[in-house]
């Protein structure tokens, strides 16, 4: 029974309110601890992580994880208790996540650059007993968490070594490791697939000021992340006749069976063999050995966007457990430096990177162009692919990147913090059409249906929309789905529903299915702007504006309007050295949009406010728009 009700939010909550019962009760094969032990046992001497001059094999990494896990046990951290991780991408971030998971405690992500009240809220909302944090943010976090009653320990790490003074009473990460054994922690309980895996905080939604914690158990979270790769793989399998895509596929998952199928890769039965092989062997020691033996040198993946963002976290762990890749981190992960990225790809021979749309792709394009103008060259022959998720990636920027690096395969995925199956599209330079994220995702039939059904449901009728009619509906995901929102029973009931004995997540995103049976994402239902009774999605208008050759970035939001109820405001960042007038934007939009979708207000800024994840800082943006329009608009 949930207790401590306060409005729609609970003061206290328990994982028992979310716990699922599975047929194979008491198993532990789908836990992060089990996955790490498998890698350390099967390929102990393969490189696991690289950051700057530091290199760790799976055996070394597992030893450090065990030391931290034993330290956490000595600190009396119990199974099911929440432990936060605050920092940017680092080996220590990964060690912390695995160590917390090994003892059955629950890791949760903290964006260290979030507003202070938001950080305080997340730590308090999780009822955290400890926070493991990067030294740069330690003193600030220590100051704002003084009055959180549940918090017992602050543990501070540096990327390799400490660079900032410690807050009073904090523990030193490396000292804890030095004082504890590298042997596997001895538990007097079992961590099972049914247990609390992690709590993931995304962006604030709807009327909520702060983000909601998304509850995952191991069965859904670990297995779902493992399966995420095969959903990314699907559009690649559908186009294996393209040599670039085939090379990228073999490089990402170099199983010898796949190589043997190369001569017949255009035949449907060859693809069926690959899919069947994956379904039978995924996550096993046999599969790990197959991938490890398929390539003498490690396949190297680099998460560029932050790990505290769910899309990056999921894809990074997917690459580890499904592809057995070596993970490379930038030496300095924030602020993002595109030159450092390209130099690292060149030096470490990185195979693929993970980004969040235009916010990361545009600086990469700019640096490649600048290097070309200055006569500098990068040896990027190893770089085969870019996987993006979470933030829209415009067709124009995709094409520019492919023109600069013709060998690249672009994989653009659609997903949410609340479900792991990501539905993807693959693009190469030769493609005539490079759609934005969420478009041209295969909806029915073929290989795209082997994982989990994905539907578009008419909000009024409750039935699936008719394809090819333009009928709008809400995206609904089935398969590996989170269990609910922490301390938010009403939101959980609204968004997580059992339909036909299977759990579904109602995403709140709107779109339709075109005549080719492809999903077409239009916008988020919560961001719909009503103009004189007509529904307008800001994303649709933004895509048109961003296609203008002088525009670097843009965002479109709705504001109150006396006559029409709401009106559109376009906030635009121009390319360096370019000029554009408000009327130019209006005329450009009128060429492809009806009059009611044309922005009433156009504003130009030097740079748009984006979070470290690449997402727009909506609160800052709205404050700016309000100040420009005047408080009477609100």
Descriptions of predicted regions:
Residues 2, 74-75, 102-175, 187, ...:
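Structural core segment of the AMP-binding/adenylate-forming
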Residues 222-303, 310-354, 366-367, 371-372:
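Conserved AMP-binding/adenylation subdomain of ANL enzymes
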Residues 87-88, 105-123, 135-140, 326-348, ...:
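ATP-dependent adenylate-forming carboxylate-activation enzymes
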Residues 171-174, 321-322, 342, 351-355, ...:
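Gly/Ser/Thr-rich phosphate-binding loop
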Residues 114-121, 131-133, 346, 353, ...:
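AMP-binding/adenylate-forming catalytic core of the ANL superfamily
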Residues 1-75, 79, 160-167, 185, ...:
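N-lobe entry segment of adenylate-forming
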Residues 13-14, 139-196, 218-225, 240-250, ...:
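ANL superfamily adenylate-forming
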Residues 54-55, 69-114, 304, 535:
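Conserved AMP-binding/adenylate-forming
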